[in-house]
Amino acid sequence: MMQCVRRCSFICGAVLSILLLLCSCQSGAGQLILPDNVPSENTSQGKKELLAALNQEYFDQFSSPNHFIQGSDDAAKTVFLYLKQYSGDDINKAVEALTENPKDDRANCADDVLRIISPSPSETYWVSYSFLSADMLEDGVLKENAAFGSVAKDLIGHRRFLVLSEAFHPAASQNAGFAVGVIGGQALVVAVFVS
């Protein structure tokens, strides 16, 4: 009887821990938004490692080092919040909004998002996403020592234009901003690249 109670307590604790992890994944502006008990100095390390993984992946594909630099997370947060609302918390609908529209080669959500973020006419914007596994998150933020290689590959592979500026130059560095959260029970990172 006592062993049964212990098992139930363990299972309930595990379920509660998973629910807390999923609920604490939030989009972030500047630094990722954290639960009150998580120190904010830990929020940037995972993003730095993701940025390093992006640069490594880009170098492997195009032989261009340090192509991505840390930018503001504001646009990524805006896109994430738009996707969450637009999709009705349906991950498939959110992903569909991020895929390429064959009519104009931009992301399906481009017009709606551009009305919200009001980009500079001299800047090019891309949007991208990658799913995250639980081992890449810690207390709702990107984990410091996680292996982000596959995430970086997805972020580069899933990039879609929001707007293409006439001043765009392919070799120019891109500012990268990130937002991490959960849509439809799936943790993901949304990235916005600006050049």
Which residues fall in each region the model found?
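Bacterial N-terminal signal peptides that target proteins for export
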Residues: 2-12
